[in-house]
Amino acid sequence: MSIQVEHPAGGYKKLFETVEELSSPLTAHVTGRIPLWLTGSLLRCGPGLFEVGSEPFYHLFDGQALLHKFDFKEGHVTYHRRFIRTDAYVRAMTEKRIVITEFGTCAFPDPCKNIFSRFFSYFRGVEVTDNALVNVYPVGEDYYACTETNFITKINPETLETIKQVDLCNYVSVNGATAHPHIENDGTVYNIGNCFGKNFSIAYNIVKIPPLQADKEDPISKSEVVVQFPCSDRFKPSYVHSFGLTPNYIVFVETPVKINLLKFLSSWSLWGANYMDCFESNETMGVWLHIADKKRKKYLNNKYRTSSFNLFHHINTYEDNEFLIVDLCCWKGFEFVYNYLYLANLRENWEEVKKNARKAPQPEVRRYVLPLNIDKADTGKNLVTLPNTTATATLRSDETIWLEPEVLFSGPRQAFEFPQINYQKSGGKPYTYAYGLGLNHFVPDRLCKLNVKTKETWVWQEPDSYPSEPIFVSHPDALEEDDGVVLSVVVSPGAGQKPAYLLILNAKDLSEVARAEVEINIPVTFHGLFKKS
């Protein structure tokens, strides 16, 4: 996909530095020519505060949520950012310490409370973070920033002001929800979260939020659970970051990375555990893939199995005759990749960064093909009859269907991650192109385009430049799937460069169209969207 480059200067460390919010937008300096049709806002979420006073956050997913916005109008660009006023942030600023436990950082006990006060706080339940640093998405006419708990935060996409916290538990039965909901073209939102099912065992609920109706009531108040997936382990749900959706099916991939709920509930308050302390890997289960009939709201008991991998991001899922095509950004093995994303590791000098990454699960882009009709299938025979794929599915004597993938891209310690597609046109449908952030030993140093049919790749890469997830924006008069541009926030600490810029690439060949430079550093961002004017 690209020549593996070295980063001895360690410029990637700028991604993990605390910054201040802005009181008003900055005007960016544009080089090149921004298409006049590109009007709207790029909204992105990520951590912006990596310590509170003398207390540091330890994990990549701990820093307090910073909401970013690049506005595009008539060829000009402005940049703005504000910290999201979550409970976690407001209380930390008020008490000048970390008050709510984050993903990999324990909250320090309140020095004003004695041991009995802290003990009795255990019986009031676990205090879950609302630190909405992962993504932002629309619901009806509103926009919400989110993490992966039951809390989402309504924000104003124009001013970046925080409006209110919303607890999803008040509307549906979920303990949390992913930061990667699917949004259909009519505005319907689908998401997944674990829940307590029958006999107090764990299950996974698919939640549907309808589009805005004529009564203008908040669509979240009309949320409903439409189907439930079983869990392979009664008390240990798998970590779920995304799922697949087509017009007729829902796909859930259950990985061996598990949350030990007994540890979560018993040791959290008393022993100072954090979220990362409660993860463990099931070394023998492999991966279970589940499907449900979306229209009939029915779980289909096809038992798809394959070897172990970590999964964070689905690229796309679609139907092809009597098969489901599931394209995934995988990490080989059962060990949790997040174990390697502590800030101490990511801030190491380059040789240490590489050394740590060599121990981690290795990335691979894979295509799995799931046969839907297995009623009359022969045991031991490959059920995949589609041309142009090497993926296989074999029915075993225990009625499980063993899947072997087709590899779409693989490079040693070279990940194609944070995938994006022309979602409005191709989400849940056959497609050709995916865009991704290239990770070099976990350091983001290139932008990539992948033809999933031919495996041809294109790359944008510059020295001492660290881009973000690419966001595809379609041309308003597009005739082809890749007619449009790709947007990415690039941190550029190298000599002679501005600290950061918004990069605009031609989506066909990743050639540069324009860039909009700012005079301040921009820390790492995870996910976001383009909101058209």
Curated annotation (Swiss-Prot):
EC number annotated for this UniProt entry: 3.1.1.64, 5.3.3.22
Modified residues (N-acetylserine): S2
Keywords associated with the record: Acetylation, Cell membrane, Cytoplasm, Endoplasmic reticulum, Hydrolase, Iron, Isomerase, Lipid metabolism, Lipoprotein, Membrane, Metal-binding, Microsome, Palmitate, Phosphoprotein, Sensory transduction, Vision
GO terms (BP aspect): retinal metabolic process; retinoid metabolic process; visual perception; zeaxanthin biosynthetic process
Subcellular location: Cytoplasm; Cell membrane; Microsome membrane
GO cellular component, one term: membrane
Cofactor annotation: Fe(2+)
Residues with the N6-acetyllysine modification: K113
InterPro entries linked to this entry: Carotenoid_Oase
Coarse class of the protein's main subcellular location: cytoplasm
Effect of C231S: Does not affect isomerization activity
Post-translational modification: Palmitoylation by LRAT regulates ligand binding specificity; the palmitoylated form (membrane form) specifically binds all-trans-retinyl-palmitate, while the soluble unpalmitoylated form binds all-trans-retinol (vitamin A).
Its membrane topology: Lipid-anchor
Domain of life: Eukaryota
Listed result of changing E417A: Loss of enzymatic isomerohydrolase
PANTHER family per the UniProt record, alphabetical: BETA-CAROTENE DIOXYGENASE (PTHR10543), RETINOID ISOMEROHYDROLASE (PTHR10543:SF57)
Quaternary assembly: Interacts with MYO7A; this mediates light-dependent intracellular transport of RPE65.
Described purpose of this protein according to its UniProt entry: Critical isomerohydrolase in the retinoid cycle involved in regeneration of 11-cis-retinal, the chromophore of rod and cone opsins. Catalyzes the cleavage and isomerization of all-trans-retinyl fatty acid esters to 11-cis-retinol which is further oxidized by 11-cis retinol dehydrogenase to 11-cis-retinal for use as visual chromophore. Essential for the production of 11-cis retinal for both rod and cone photoreceptors. Also capable of catalyzing the isomerization of lutein to meso-zeaxanthin an eye-specific carotenoid.
Protein name, per record: Retinoid isomerohydrolase
Organism: Canis lupus familiaris (Dog)
